[in-house]
Regions:
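P-loop NTPase nucleotide-binding core
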Residues: 39-44, 48-153, 337
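Conserved C-terminal helix/linker of AAA+ ATPases
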Residues: 244, 267-290
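Conserved Walker B catalytic segment
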Residues: 124-192, 201
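Helix-loop-helix "sensor" segment of P-loop NTPases
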Residues: 198-249, 271-273
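Short, Lys/Arg-enriched N-terminal segment that forms or immediately precedes the first helix
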Residues: 7-11, 285-300
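A short, basic N-terminal segment
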Residues: 1-36, 41, 59, 111, ...
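C-terminal helical "lid" of AAA+/P-loop NTPase domains
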Residues: 245-250, 256-270, 308-314, 344
């Protein structure tokens, strides 16, 4: 039996929860020549929403869409690598004409192009070491976008990551290329709201006022409850509203983990059966135990002050004034300067996020594990 609670891969429109107004706004903006910034906490569905929009008929039929996630990148070389690979894999393979144009334009990495006689398809064997001059490669990539036979839509997920690159002029470099490119519009998305907000809202920054800003909140519980019950009913199963509420509130409306719990609850519920809160609680406990080794390994790489602060933030839930004497005393931390050094690294490692001077564990499941 098909499981309608999709965790990875393509989501059919009928299995996509809510977000109709958000999708309409994104599609309207981007197809009318505007750039847009989407800000949301991690795992509330921004990437799936972007994929859903790029897969809409109006975009699929009239635009070339290119999508990359740069969360794991740490330099301009890696950025050029990811974007170059995406241009070839997601755009150039659409037609022989596009392929020839990309091959002729990406001259700085021309030796990476080849052909597979078995599958009868072109290949692009690019490795990070092949990019010796990333600025020149980026210039060529944007030239490819400019010369494409259809207008391009480029989605860059976790865009705030460029702020961590050692190349301090990265924002100015990218802004220059984007401004010059008349044949592409951009979707910038990010989960570190404070960094994305500063990047697009501060007058001194290169991306100031260059895109429409959209905040993506969690799906309201009433809408998700209606969605989940409807899918269970469609397959002749049932689930208690209280069970859905338990999953929803445990993960603070985090779409990814709620879907994961619902996916397993659907698997465990027989036709004519009912998923209840007891089942949901057992699934959540199992999820935490399944990730014990992963979270333990993450902690093993942290210094003692970083671990102590991570546990303190997990215990607080939403931690404020973390360098204050009261917070330090309550959680037996070392000093204000020690906390400042530790939080800088925890933010850099994406273990903690911040919004409006409040700090919280980035991964809700890890937060639950830390409190066990």
């Amino acid at each position: 039996m098909e499981n309608p609670f999709i965790i990875t891969g393509y989501i059919k429109p009928e299995y996509f929860c809510d977000r109709k107004q958000e999708a309409k706004r994104i599609i309207t903006k981007i197809t009318n020549g505007e750039n847009i910034v989407i800000m949301a906490a991690r795992r509330v569905g921004k990437s799936k929403l972007i994929d859903f929009c790029l897969d809409s008929p109006i975009i699929k039929d009239n635009f070339i869409s290119i999508s990359i996630d740069i969360l794991r990148t740490s330099s301009i070389n890696e950025f050029a690598f990811e974007l170059g690979k995406a241009v070839f894999e997601q755009a150039a393979r659409r037609s022989t004409k596009l392929l020839k144009m990309v091959v002729n334009t990406l001259k700085s990495i021309n030796g990476c192009f080849g052909y597979d006689p078995i599958s009868n398809t072109p290949t692009f064997n690019l490795s990070l070491g092949d990019i010796s001059n990333p600025l020149y490669t980026l210039e060529e990539i944007f030239a490819c976008l400019e010369q494409a036979d259809k207008k391009c839509i480029v989605a860059i997920d976790e865009f705030q990551q460029i702020g961590y690159y050692p190349e301090k002029n990265m924002e100015a470099v990218l802004r220059t290329y984007i401004q010059r490119c008349s044949n592409a519009n951009f979707i910038f998305s990010g989960s570190e709201r404070h960094l994305i907000t500063e990047m697009f809202s501060e007058k001194a920054r290169p991306f100031y006022n260059s895109a429409d800003i959209m905040n993506l909140d969690v799906i309201p519980i009433d809408r998700y409850t209606e969605f989940a019950i409807g899918l269970f009913h469609h397959f002749d199963k049932d689930i208690q509203a209280e069970a859905i509420a338990l999953a929803y509130h445990t993960f603070g409306g985090n779409t990814y983990y709620i879907q994961k719990v619902m996916h397993e609850a659907f698997n465990q519920t027989d036709p004519k059966g009912v998923a209840d809160s007891e089942m949901i609680d057992a699934i959540i406990r199992s999820l935490i135990l399944d990730n014990d080794r992963k979270f333990s390994e993450i902690l093993s790489r942290l210094t003692l002050p970083q671990k102590e602060l991570l546990y303190a933030i997990a215990k607080a839930g939403m931690a404020k004034k973390i360098t204050s004497a009261a917070f330090i005393k309550k959680h037996n931390l070392r000093s204000g300067s020690s906390v400042q050094s530790a939080i800088k690294k925890l933010l850099e490692y994406h273990l903690v996020s911040t919004s409006q001077a409040t700090y919280y564990i980035d991964d809700q499941l890890m937060g639950l594990w830390l409190k066990m």
